[in-house]
Regions:
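Metal-cofactor-binding active-site regions of metalloenzymes
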Residues: 1-185, 194-205, 210, 216-276
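Conserved hydrophobic beta-strand within the GNAT/NAT acetyltransferase core sheet
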Residues: 187-189
């Protein structure tokens, strides 16, 4: 019996191979990583105190995603790594403006990543797609990536906002989400990770077809009585998938231990969860 697996929530800049990061740092003379002996431990950051602290490592990975060649390789290796884990369908997200420079346009960034994915598909059969991310702590960034997503919607599979969730609720970007929905760009919105149920509700109100993380929907459920609050009811009745990322939640200290994670409660309640 073959088990077909999918990954719906993965950040391209969060999964560089340690050896590749070291090699690219040397090639590009990226000094912050040149003297790091154990890059894998440096990136794992399992002792992070918060989501914001955890995200600091992304500064270094995105710095290496500065050329067509690097992006293409990183995308290929990401899809290859997924294939080696038994994944047949892979959706990866990335904030393209991190890579735009004098020699790379937004289209170049998208094309480079898709080229890497296509190479992996040709070699292994894995199907991969790109979700563009705007950074929610930078309003102008979200506006620009919205335009990019609309202009190149045939080359991508969706749009998201990433970055620190607290204090940057989805409602701040209602105009952008409206434009994306009007142009038939699929929305999955980070919510219910760094902030609570209100953030999830705002994501739904703005057209999200999936919720990135969404684990804090558990706060809208009375586990003793089995009663759902309005947001949990909407997700349950409309079969809105939650992109649960258990190890990420542990690394960012949302939960101190795997046994404390509410994934089993959500599964037992028949919520539409995916594990990433």
């Amino acid at each position: 019996c073959v088990m077909y697996k999918a990954v719906l929530h993965d950040h391209l800049d969060g999964g560089l191979r340690a050896a590749t990061a070291k090699e690219l740092a040397i090639k590009d003379n990226y000094s912050p990583l040149l003297n790091v002996d154990d890059i894998e431990s440096f990136f794992n950051r399992e002792s992070s105190e918060s989501l914001e602290d955890y995200l600091e490592a992304f500064v270094h990975t995105t710095a290496l995603m500065n050329s067509y060649e690097n992006l293409e390789r990183i995308a290929f290796e990401a899809a290859e790594d997924m294939h080696n884990e038994g994944i047949t369908h892979y959706e990866s997200r990335y904030a393209p403006l991190y890579s735009v420079n004098n020699s790379l346009t937004p289209k170049d960034v998208i094309d480079a990543i898709n080229s890497g994915f296509k190479q992996a598909e040709d070699l292994y059969g894995i199907q991969s797609g790109l979700i563009l991310c705007g950074m929610r702590n930078d309003t102008n960034n979200v506006k620009q990536v919205t335009e990019i997503a609309v202009n190149y919607k045939e080359k991508i599979i969706g749009f998201d906002i990433a970055g620190p969730e607290l204090n940057y609720l989805p409602s701040l970007f209602s105009d952008e989400f409206k434009k994306l929905v009007e142009n038939n760009v699929n929305l999955t919105i980070h919510a219910g990770e760094g902030d609570g149920v209100n953030s999830i509700q705002e994501a739904l109100d703005n057209g999200a077809k999936r919720i990135g993380h969404g684990v804090r929907i558990i706060e809208d459920i009375d586990l003793e009585t089995g009663l759902f609050g309005p947001t949990a009811t909407h997700i349950f009745e409309n079969n809105i998938p939650l992109e649960i990322c258990i190890s990420s939640n542990i690394h960012t200290n949302m939960y101190s231990d795997y046994k404390d994670h509410p994934i089993k409660d959500l599964i037992d309640l028949n919520f539409p969860v995916t594990i990433n």
